[in-house]
Amino acid sequence: MKIAIAGASGRMGRMLIEAVLNDSDAQLVGALDRAGSPFLGQDAGAFLGKETGVKLTDDLDAVFAQADYLIDFTRPEGTIAHVAAALRHDVKLVIGTTGFTAEQKAELQAAAARIGIVFAANMSVGVNVTLKLLEFAAKHFSHGYDIEIIEAHHRHKVDAPSGTALMMGEAVAGALGRSLEDCAVYGRHGVTGERDPSTIGFAAVRGGDIVGDHTVLFAGIGERIEITHKSSSRVSYAQGALRAVRFLSARGAGLFDMQDVLGLR
């Protein structure tokens, strides 16, 4: 599997590079970084003390010409540029970027008519199994329980609520036959009045080096149920991304997510 990594100098990019180098079925053929990065020209394995022969570059076409797959955990504007290059070079994409607008998501959907794309806000096996647990719980706590989603991440995260929190909200709302867009409440401040029982609330915490904590609270009278997932390392995301690459190796064009990859549908 000839794999290139986007955002190669970042925390997630380095974790992905390490995962690819440690996988006997995978070959690192490219490492993209943003224009102006001080790491351009550096060997992709330097942070591991390894010489890979792959240099960090901002030349999209040079990287895509070598790759069969790109793994991208960057930012929406960067990912959209990578999608255009992937279409030019017929490269399949594994996308873990979050914070897309509706218009940008539509661009991913359109691109998937020509290339295979796995797009998931969270690629850990644990989170995706948790989504199934939430669907089950929501169906059984549909009356008399208020639903709140609380997430916490490191101080450097730029979007809120997290993509994973939104995935959880969509799983719960879908199980209840609702649209998350219509029932979500993002944060509360001041005199808000009594809680609307049809809503799903979101709260975001940012601080320190928290990798990612998510709790969905079903609060009833006399009891509450909490379903929580906590990430202690980004390695679970990297392993999930490689699993997604293997999934795409046997697929043609189409837009998939980790539920497809893990056979949870």
UniProtKB/Swiss-Prot annotation:
Q: What biological-process terms (Gene Ontology) are attached? A: diaminopimelate biosynthetic process; lysine biosynthetic process via diaminopimelate
Q: What class of enzyme is it?
A: oxidoreductase
What does the entry list as the binding residues for (S)-2,3,4,5-tetrahydrodipicolinate? 154, 163-164
The protein's annotated pathway: Amino-acid biosynthesis; L-lysine biosynthesis via DAP pathway; (S)-tetrahydrodipicolinate from L-aspartate: step 4/4
Q: Which reaction does it catalyse?
A: (S)-2,3,4,5-tetrahydrodipicolinate + NAD(+) + H2O = (2S,4S)-4-hydroxy-2,3,4,5-tetrahydrodipicolinate + NADH + H(+); (S)-2,3,4,5-tetrahydrodipicolinate + NADP(+) + H2O = (2S,4S)-4-hydroxy-2,3,4,5-tetrahydrodipicolinate + NADPH + H(+)
GO terms assigned for molecular function: 4-hydroxy-tetrahydrodipicolinate reductase; NAD binding; NADP binding; oxidoreductase activity, acting on CH or CH2 groups, NAD or NADP as acceptor
What residues bind NAD(+), as annotated? 7-12, 33, 96-98, 120-123
Q: Where in the cell is it found?
A: Cytoplasm
The yes or no answer to whether the keyword Amino-acid biosynthesis is present is: yes
Q: Where does NADP(+) bind?
A: 34
Q: Which PROSITE patterns match?
A: DAPB (PS01298)
Q: Which InterPro entries match?
A: DapB_C, DapB_N, DapB_N_CS, DHDPR_bac, NAD(P)-bd_dom_sf
Cross-referenced SUPFAM superfamilies, in alphabetical order?
A: Glyceraldehyde-3-phosphate dehydrogenase-like, C-terminal domain (SSF55347), NAD(P)-binding Rossmann-fold domains (SSF51735)
| Pfam name, any one | DapB_C
- The yes or no answer to whether the keyword Transmembrane helix is present is no
Q: Which UniProt keywords apply?
A: Amino-acid biosynthesis, Cytoplasm, Diaminopimelate biosynthesis, Lysine biosynthesis, NAD, NADP, Oxidoreductase
Per the UniProt entry, the Enzyme Commission number(s) are: 1.17.1.8
* Active-site residues, record numbering mapped to chain: 153 (proton donor/acceptor), 157 (proton donor)
According to its UniProt entry, what is the function of this protein? Catalyzes the conversion of 4-hydroxy-tetrahydrodipicolinate (HTPA) to tetrahydrodipicolinate.
Which PANTHER family does the annotation name? Answer: 4-HYDROXY-TETRAHYDRODIPICOLINATE REDUCTASE 1, CHLOROPLASTIC-RELATED, DIHYDRODIPICOLINATE REDUCTASE
User: Would you tell me the protein name for this molecule?
Assistant: 4-hydroxy-tetrahydrodipicolinate reductase
Organism annotation = Burkholderia ambifaria (strain MC40-6)
